[in-house]
Structures are given as structure tokens and as C-alpha cells.
Amino acid sequence: MITLIAAISTNNALGKDNDLIWRLPADLKRFKKVTSGHHILMGRNTFESIGKPLPNRTSVIITRNNNYKKEGCLIAYSLEEAIAFTEGKDAFIIGGAQVYKQALENNLIDQLDITRVHQEFEADVFFPEIDSTVWKEIYREDFLADEKNVYDYSFISYQKI
């Protein structure tokens, strides 16, 4: 199964200046838990913002640069090639905005795992609208802000209809 995983705000903001806009420790903990042991597929800018391969995951970087190399990572020149690296095993598309858009437009994913941050943010990259004629909410858990997580948020899973 190919799952797209993203944290987005109420106004679908993803990030600004190639970085996350907010810090939400519960989301990072969940991301680590669900992606651990799997392939994670990402664009080059997303990888560069992380800075290194994440532990206990196979990092696949999608780039148009034929000379791009990163130790400890697989390099793909298209999203389809990145998916082929997974050899049919569960994998997660972790960004960025262009990769998300391509995956959604080309019907390459089976599930969406979304952390919805209940706040609007100024951003320069946004997540596409989730089309309710294509995606059905199958799981939702809502949380109020607390001492560690300063925003209300929800973990929501969608399955293709």
C-alpha cells in the first residue's frame, strides 16, 4: 500500500521557506511510528530540509538532477520509479508539495494519513484540496492543545473510494 502522509493546516498550508511552519511533537512521534521500517519517498527539497536519511527507513529521493547522489539513500528520477523501489511493500510519500500533487493527480496512492493542525498559517506551499468524491474518511482522532502541542490537531486517515 502506498500512503501519502502529511501535516497540513486549516488553510492547507504545508510549509514556508522549505521548512515546517509549526512544531507539533505528537505529529512527529506518530510520523516516526508509522513510517519506521518502511520506504519513505520524497522530493529533493524535502530531503534537503531533513538533512539526512531517517533511521530505520529506506529513503528514496526523487530528483530531476541525474548527478544527484546522497549516501544512504536511493535516487529516483520520477515518482513512478520511486514507487518501483518499494517492490510492492508498504511505503509512505512524505512530500513535498509537488510530489503530493503528482501522486494525487496520477492516482498513485491508496491512503492519506493527514495530521490536520486546526490553525491557519501563512505559507508558500499548500496541500491540494482533498476530494470527497475520491477519498472517504475512515479514521479520526481529535486532540486539544496541551503543554507540548500548542495547537489543536486531528489525525485523519482517508481511503480511496
Report each predicted region and the residues it spans.
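Enzymes that bind and transform nitrogen-containing heteroaromatic metabolites
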Residues: 1-161
